[in-house]
């Protein structure tokens, strides 16, 4: 298929006439010949990764969507006739399939699924969609693997149509007929709709709005393809695990296009890393000024919603109702992504100076050589069908474990690898399906202390409790569904992972990327003495943006000012070496650029977390004590770089365990001694106590008592575990690092 490359002449003769974004562009410079050559090289580099679909396959998708669209129209006519609508209405009743996501954006890859939306008039009910339309799909020869998920947060029908996976949502509009030229961006369409229809419409509305807010769609698409591939190769593409999903990456690329409206893909990729390695999080990324439609729908607004002030990396969807697409981002995942942005900037600097090729940007660093300590999570189920359900649930809650680990006073970073792996069987004679995730840990370096005792038992058990509670209440729990956790050192990973996964990668050049300190301690990510490669690892590169002058008088515990204010400041980016060659952005100019950001969203520095004692019981899961209510205003100290994050005001705080109680309870666990690591490999002595993971049946009398039970941070509306016996995995992970 053709790959459009905007030429120098066309950009100069047809500059964008519109003003895009909430600020003025940083540069209007037109591309040079070297930029066009670099863009062509970028395309050639991307091709082997399968990011471009062949024209034949694209036409096949169009044909399938056409058949699906005809089925929808036919079905709606049948429904209309069954409900005795006038013939004049039936003839023009319409109905339509819309697409959204990567396919609608034009950046889908080979074999990717299609996200679709079925839009119907007001006399067609959601129940019709999940009954008569489902039955109609079942009769189609091309349709395989048909299944309905009616109880999902966004109800969906999933199917495989002639080999293409399709997810179909449903929305009923308050219209008598559905015209062919219907524009879903019209906010008036949301009137009198139920919340499920609004959620279903949101994907299409956001996708269409993004495409209308970029200066050049072809340049946007090619840049987004490159950034998505880079994010996937660097294991930071996963909304569910606290990184960014497809729509978030699309909005970041769209904002870059707005700031450099005449630039082409090679320049835009470089500017993407420049802008977001300098971004003053948690200032929000906005593609347009939020608009109020007076429909009383909840929108992202830190002035109104206290929890919105605690979002760490807000990227706001442009369509009403505006939402933060990155609410899952944690301290650790933001640190990882910011460090990757910095490394991306260093590499693209080299590329623009002809010191490196594009392939270097897409080299995948080896996650399993980054850290000395890892937590391995194992999820197992007796059948493949149960494994799929169980793995989906466990994966959706891993971010809760990461959040709990990073609040531990001894942990600097908890980095989960978005990839899951098949786990070795526990017994070759037993049929069992197991999936494994790996979390890299960096422990805080302590000064004036010889010993560092770390007890992760509570963090693991709290996570396990949350997953089991969700499984039981969703009626998917089976007795043989298990979760296990273990601590392993880097050199022990070969016992769990295949050799090709652990293969060492070529060392990246990261000249100009400096690792910063967190909590006045450097990150201990050095390699074992026998390891020859070194991959720069995430650090606390994040910087807390100061309060602006207008907000300083309000006090830190007052609501955050409006992000919709028209005033925007230009925050001067720190100095960066901009390549002198092959750059269309004034190579002879200053070495720093002004990155426009919304200065009306100040950084909210949360209060330091308290240390609360906790006791590990040998007969039941440990549950946190109720956290103090966050409704009362709390005076927050001045911003501190790297301060430990607390939960949102309306959430509970995880208690900490004192050293005394840790020593007392260590006698209750059956521990397995393993060796560990310290910074100095030749002098380290690490006593690791890891209790064997046991499956216990907790009797009703010893089960979680309601009076002791508090809700999870993610499941505040879920009741306590039932009194009947259930298997509970005991996970005791205790480490004593002797320095």
Swiss-Prot record:
Positions of region (Disordered): 1-22, 523-725
Enzyme Commission number, as recorded: 2.7.7.19
CC cofactor: Mg(2+); Mn(2+)
Gene Ontology terms: biological process: co-transcriptional mRNA 3'-end processing, cleavage and polyadenylation pathway; cytosolic mRNA polyadenylation
Post-translational modification: Polysumoylated. Varying sumoylation depending on tissue- and cell-type. Highly sumoylated in bladder and NIH 3T3 cells. Sumoylation is required for nuclear localization and enhances PAP stability. Desumoylated by SENP1. Inhibits polymerase activity. Hyperphosphorylation on multiple CDK2 consensus and non-consensus sites in the C-terminal Ser/Thr-rich region represses PAP activity in late M-phase. Phosphorylation/dephosphorylation may regulate the interaction between PAP and CPSF.
Residues spanned by motif Nuclear localization signal 2: 644-659
Locations listed in the record: Nucleus
Composition skew (Polar residues), residue ranges: 535-557, 566-582, 691-715
A GO cellular component annotation in the UniProt record: nucleoplasm
PANTHER family xref list: POLY A POLYMERASE, POLY(A) POLYMERASE ALPHA
Protein name, per record: Poly(A) polymerase alpha
Origin species: Mus musculus
Phylogenetic placement of the source organism: Eukaryota, Metazoa, Chordata, Craniata, Vertebrata
Gene designation: Papola
């Amino acid at each position: 298929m053709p790959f459009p490359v905007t030429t120098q002449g066309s950009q100069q003769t047809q500059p964008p006439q519109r003003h895009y974004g909430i600020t003025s562009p940083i540069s209007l410079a037109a591309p040079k010949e070297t930029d066009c050559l670099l863009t062509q090289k970028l395309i050639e580099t991307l091709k082997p990764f399968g990011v471009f679909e062949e024209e034949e396959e694209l036409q096949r998708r169009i044909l399938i969507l056409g058949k699906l669209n005809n089925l929808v129209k036919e079905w709606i006519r049948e429904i209309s006739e069954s409900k005795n609508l006038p013939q004049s209405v039936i003839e023009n009743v319409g109905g339509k399939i819309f697409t959204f996501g990567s396919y609608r954006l034009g950046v889908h890859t080979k074999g990717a699924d299609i996200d679709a939306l079925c839009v119907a008039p007001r006399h067609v009910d959601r129940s019709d969609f999940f009954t008569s339309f489902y039955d109609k799909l079942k009769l189609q020869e091309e349709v395989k693997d048909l299944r309905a998920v009616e109880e999902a947060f966004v109800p969906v029908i999933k199917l495989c149509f002639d080999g293409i996976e399709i997810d179909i949502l449903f929305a009923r509009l308050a219209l008598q007929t559905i015209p062919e030229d219907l524009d879903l961006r019209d906010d008036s369409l949301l009137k009198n709709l139920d919340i499920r229809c609004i959620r279903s419409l949101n994907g299409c509305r956001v996708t269409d709005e993004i495409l209308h807010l970029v200066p050049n769609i072809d340049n946007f698409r090619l840049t987004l393809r490159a950034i998505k591939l880079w994010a996937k190769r660097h294991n930071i593409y996963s909304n569910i695990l606290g990184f960014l999903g497809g729509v978030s990456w699309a909005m970041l690329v769209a904002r870059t296009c707005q700031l450099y409206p005449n630039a082409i893909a090679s320049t835009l990729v470089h500017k993407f890393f420049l802008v977001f390695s300098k971004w003053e999080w948690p200032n929000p990324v906005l593609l347009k000024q939020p608009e109020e439609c007076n429909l009383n729908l909840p929108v992202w607004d830190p002035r109104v919603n206290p929890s919105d002030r605690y979002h760490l990396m807000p990227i706001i969807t442009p369509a009403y109702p505006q939402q933060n697409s990155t609410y899952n981002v944690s301290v650790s995942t933001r640190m990882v992504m910011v460090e990757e942005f910095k490394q991306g900037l260093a590499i693209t600097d080299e590329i623009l100076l002809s010191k490196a090729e594009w392939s270097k940007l897409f080299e995948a660093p080896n996650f399993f050589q980054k850290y000395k300590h890892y937590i391995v999570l194992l999820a197992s189920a007796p059948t493949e069908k149960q494994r799929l359900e169980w793995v989906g649930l466990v994966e959706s809650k891993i971010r809760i474990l990461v959040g709990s680990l990073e609040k531990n006073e001894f942990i600097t970073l908890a980095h989960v690898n978005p990839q899951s792996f098949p786990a070795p069987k526990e017994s070759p004679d037993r049929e069992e399906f197991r999936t494994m995730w790996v979390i890299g840990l960096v422990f805080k370096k302590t000064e004036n202390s010889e010993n560092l005792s770390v007890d992760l038992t509570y963090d693991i058990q709290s996570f396990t409790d949350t997953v089991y509670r969700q499984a039981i209440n969703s009626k998917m729990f089976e007795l043989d569904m298990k979760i296990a956790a273990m601590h392993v050192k880097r050199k022990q990973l070969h016992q769990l992972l295949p050799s090709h996964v652990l293969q060492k990668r070529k060392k990246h050049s990261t000249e100009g990327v400096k690792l910063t300190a967190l909590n006045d301690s450097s990150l201990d990510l050095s390699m074992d003495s026998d390891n020859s490669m070194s991959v720069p690892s995430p650090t606390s590169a994040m910087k807390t943006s100061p309060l602006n002058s207008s907000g300083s008088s309000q006090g830190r515990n007052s609501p955050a000012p409006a992000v919709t204010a028209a005033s925007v400041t230009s925050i001067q980016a720190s100095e960066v070496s901009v390549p002198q060659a092959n750059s269309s952005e004034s190579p002879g100019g200053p070495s720093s650029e002004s990155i426009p950001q919304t200065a009306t969203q100040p950084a909210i520095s949360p209060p330091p977390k308290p240390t609360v004692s906790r006791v590990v019981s040998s007969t039941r899961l440990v549950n946190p004590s109720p956290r103090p209510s966050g409704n009362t205003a709390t005076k927050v100290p001045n911003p501190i770089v790297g301060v430990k994050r607390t939960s949102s005001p309306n959430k509970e705080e995880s208690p900490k365990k004192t050293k005394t109680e840790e020593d007392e309870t260590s006698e209750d666990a059956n521990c397995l001694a393993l060796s560990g690591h310290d910074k100095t490999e030749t002098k380290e002595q690490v006593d690791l106590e890891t209790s064997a993971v046991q499956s216990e049946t907790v009797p009703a009398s010893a089960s979680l008592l309601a009076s002791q039970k508090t809700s999870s941070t993610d499941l505040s509306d879920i009741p306590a575990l039932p009194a009947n016996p259930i298997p509970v995995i005991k996970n005791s992970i205790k480490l004593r690092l002797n320095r």
